Amino acid sequence: MKKNILLFWCLLCTVTVWAQADTTQKIIPGRKNSPEQQLKPYVILISVDGLRYDYAEKYGAVNLLSWSAGGVKAESMIPSYPSLTFPNHYSIVTGLYPSHHGLVNNYFYDRSRNDSYSMRNPKTIQEGSWYGGTPLWVLAEQQQMLTASFYWVGSEADIKGVFPTYYYRYNEIIPIDRRIQIVKDWLQLPEESRPHLITFYFPEVDHAGHSYGPDAPQTQQAVRWVDSCLQKLTAAVKETGLPVSYILVSDHGMTNVDVDNTLSMPPAVDTAKFIIPRGSELLMLYAKNKEDIQPVYEKLKKEEQHFKVYLRSNMPSYFHFGEKDDVMGRIGDILLIPDWPRVFHFTPNRKPNPGAHGFDPYKVKDMHASFFAWGPAFKSNLKIPSFENVNVYPIVTKILGLKYTEKIDGTSEVADKILKNP
């Protein structure tokens, strides 16, 4: 009886969340493509969350492999540290490392605001002042080129006062066939109203990888399902007759973790003295009193077993995640990084998910993401070495003829290799 009651309440809560989800398209009125921008080509930037660099071959994503054979495939794409969803999606569209654009984790604390950001809190997700840099859709809109987003980190926020012309707030309710039809509808709008940059997002592979692990049949099914959806998407877009180029990326990979030997909070940490946002593969401690930082750090160094401890000031430079990099002051005072495949876990009555990401991508190859590109802008049958995801930004700006003056961390080296007319 108790189980039935619990199930009822779980279902009720789920239905309530679905009912509250905002599934309406947002349209910013009064915008038009300039005559110059109406002549530009089109880019659809697709993210398949958690699509590890080897999944396409491992699980037989036949459509994706076929398109990349006629286009470009990277050995892998290296995520920025930490290899987590929000920091890396935003790095892809800003060309900046997380420490430079401000989304330093999925959950973090901002000292100057005395407030915390959470990927699960619509209030913070939709507040533009949390986001640094100039995402691609903002750059395009500033130059009178219309954009659309069917989900991307930051696309629901008024970054620099700008939204995409067409966008949706994130939900997983709208059926994929409906989403594809909407993309086609966007591309069939009159030229003055038609978006030239569209972002599109798939969460399913990441969900399966977390819940079942990267080697599970459910993960294979998710990869193949997304591959079939991509075929539907490209077929629908082809009917428009427009010169559309595709860039398909992922934010990170996925790895198996040790669910039986997890790490608890080290005894040296008095949790009453620190603000500690959620974390498993990276734990950031923000001291309420700066005088507590050094003594706790020294105690942690003595307890250092199956994890590494750093101060913000002595993080390895290749992370681009230290005090000198921390433009917005959002990196923790003390950072605890578990040794792969260990994770921090603070829920004793249940095990963590078997699949995870967030580890050092230069030490754990499973963190590497995917990069595929095809369409009229790209060279054919080209395989390139691994590269950092901050280099995607210049690829898109070159295809669309967008100019940027702000300093970014990416370069045009990859774009020059893969574009027909860089």
State what each model feature region is:
Residues L96-G213:
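His/Asp/Glu-rich, glycine-adjacent segments
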Residues R278-K383, F387-K398:
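Active-site neighborhoods of enzymes that stabilize oxyanions during catalysis
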Residues M1-Q25:
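Bacterial Sec-dependent N-terminal signal peptides
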Residues I176-Q188, V205-Y246, P295-E298, V396:
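A long, amphipathic alpha-helix that forms part
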Residues A21-L39, Y53-Q142, D158:
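Active-site nucleophile/metal-coordination loop of metallo-enzymes that catalyze phosphate/sulfate
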Residues D22-T23, S228, T271:
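Coil residues (strongly favoring Ser/Thr
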Residues L45, N63, W225-M265:
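Metal-dependent active-site segment of extracytoplasmic phospho-/sulfohydrolases and closely related
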Residues L39-V43, G70-A74, Q142-A148, E192-I198, ...:
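Loop/turn elements at helix/coil->beta-strand transitions in domains of secreted/extracellular proteins
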